[in-house]
A protein has these predicted regions:
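Accessory recognition modules or surfaces
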Residues: 1-12, 17-18, 38, 42-57
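C-terminal helical "tail/cap" subdomain of flavin- and related membrane-associated enzymes
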Residues: 2-8, 28, 72-74, 83-93, ...
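Residues at the starts of beta-strands that form the adenosine-phosphate
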Residues: 9, 32, 240-243
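Conserved mid-domain beta->alpha element of the FAD-binding
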Residues: 12-32, 36-39, 165-168, 192, ...
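Short glycine-/acidic-enriched loop or helix-start segments at secondary-structure transitions
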Residues: 22, 45, 137-138, 174-177, ...
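Active-site-adjacent segment of FAD-dependent monooxygenases/related oxidoreductases
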Residues: 42-120, 129-130, 386-387, 392-393, ...
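Short, flexible helix/strand-to-coil boundary loops that buttress conserved ligand/catalytic motifs
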Residues: 46-47, 65-66, 75-76, 177-178, ...
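Conserved FAD-binding catalytic core of PHBH/FMO-like flavoproteins
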Residues: 73, 83, 104, 108, ...
Length: 434
């Protein structure tokens, strides 16, 4: 008879959606987990964050993790349609370039999805206000030791575990230690972002106008392509509108470890004036009415060749920082977590040597790395197309006003990303009916 080993312990660095997804997947695989997160408490209300799209596979994975799968639909709206528009800023008119009525995404606010996953986990696994400092693997490679600072007291604590999971985002401290020569690549543009709560002004001129200009809001991912710029627009649950506007500019000076940049009132006023020039009046009005817009600096990273080391594994943006144009960031993190959990469940048996763990990590890497590498590069390409940046020296930048054949816009649709609908076979058991 083969007996399962006693529970192993994973230390997860990062308490965002990727970290929470890993926690759930590993608990279901029979592991104990502890989550180290530098934030002092779980996010409440609406912190700096915005809308995110969930593809069909990510939806199914999340629902398999919930005791009440229907809860996902209570905090999301459907995105059945993926529509790309060309906009002439001078004439203030838009027209359809592409329309896919079978996207089958759902859209959530970051806070709502985070709360859904957080409430599906035991409270005791979280160590809030803990800043990751360093880690090392024991000489005999039987455990990993993590050092963290308790931010409230400045105390340095050590945590031992069998596996370190780095889910600490695109500027991952864990990745920096393992791959010091790997640097983030500035995309050439930043993104203004905002969420407008219209729950108390549903009949305002702004909301009536935006619904007339974008009649499929509540079921559509709108992309507006202007001259060397583009924007996205979606409706979120609880009467909120989420917009993003990508602007070509030199790389800003980054302060701290966040890709979110503080903005001044002067910057906001300048942005409002530009919106009037670039977009149709309805979209410009929405942008101007949104309180507390913020700026994300857009980075990605050339694909790496390795995301596992002995007892350390990278997931999500820590493994493959990506631009946001193909809706991959959250979806890749969720799929990374699900695959890692299933690989550990498959390989962690009765054998007392480390071969089981290594086999699990190697299979995780072999499944995910080829896919994420292609998707990161495709998203980079799509971003450069939409921003009117050169792809090749002999290829002219994309001009949406001059696009008049399917070859001109085939890369714009979400479903044309590599491996768009692929489901790793190791996940088959998650969706088998009982």
């Amino acid at each position: 008879m083969i007996l399962k080993k006693e529970k192993q312990k994973a230390i997860i660095v990062g308490g965002s959606i990727g970290g929470l997804s890993c926690a759930k997947a590993l608990i279901l695989a029979g592991w104990d987990v502890v989550v180290l997160e530098k934030s002092h408490a779980p996010p409440m209300g609406s912190p700096t964050g915005a809308g995110l799209g969930l593809d069909t596979l990510a939806q199914e994975i999340i629902q398999s993790w919930l005791s009440q799968p229907e809860l996902l639909h209570r905090v999301t709206l459907p995105l059945t349609i993926d529509q790309n528009l060309a906009t002439d800023g001078a004439k203030k008119v838009s027209w359809v370039l592409t329309r896919d009525e079978n996207l089958n995404f759902r859209v959530a606010h970051w806070t709502d999805l985070h709360g859904l996953l957080y409430n599906a986990l035991p409270n005791e696994i979280f160590q809030w206000g803990h800043l990751y400092l360093s880690s090392c693997i024991s000489d005999d490679k039987t455990f990993v030791k993590v050092k963290a600072k308790v931010l409230q007291t400045d105390e340095i604590v050590e945590v031992d575990g069998d596996l370190l999971v780095a889910a600490d985002g695109s500027r991952s401290s864990v990745r920096q230690c393992l791959l010091p020569d790997v640097k983030l690549r500035y995309s050439g543009y930043c993104a203004w972002r905002g969420v407008l709560d219209f729950s108390e002004c549903e009949n305002s001129e702004t909301i009536v106008g935006i619904r007339k200009a974008y009649p499929d809001l509540g079921n559509c991912l709108y992309m507006d392509l202007g001259s060397r710029t583009h924007s996205t627009l979606t409706e979120l649950m609880y009467k909120r509108l989420n917009w993003i506007w990508f602007v070509n500019q030199p790389e800003p000076e980054l302060k701290g470890n966040s890709v979110t940049m503080k903005v001044s009132n002067d910057m906001i006023r300048t942005m409002h004036r530009e919106a009037d020039k670039v977009w149709v009046p309805e979209l410009a009005g929405l942008v101007k009415e949104t309180k507390d817009p913020f700026v994300n600096i857009i980075y990605d990273c050339d694909p790496v060749e390795q995301i596992v080391w002995d007892r350390v594994v990278l997931i999500g943006e820590a493994a493959h920082p990506t631009t946001p144009h193909c809706g991959r960031s959250t979806n890749m993190s969720i799929l990374d977590a699900a695959v890692l959990g299933k690989c550990l469940d498959k390989w962690w048996g009765a054998d007392e040597n480390n071969s089981n763990l290594q086999s699990a990590l190697e299979e995780y890497q072999s499944i995910r790395l080829p896919v994420t590498s292609k998707q990161v590069l495709h998203s980079r390409k799509v971003g450069r197309i939409k921003q009117g940046l050169r792809l090749l020296p002999d290829r002219q930048p994309f001009d949406p006003k001059a696009a008049n054949s399917p070859e001109d816009w085939q890369d714009l649709q979400q479903r044309n990303i590599p491996h768009f609908a692929d489901v790793p076979s190791i996940l088959d058991s998650m969706f088998c009916s009982t």
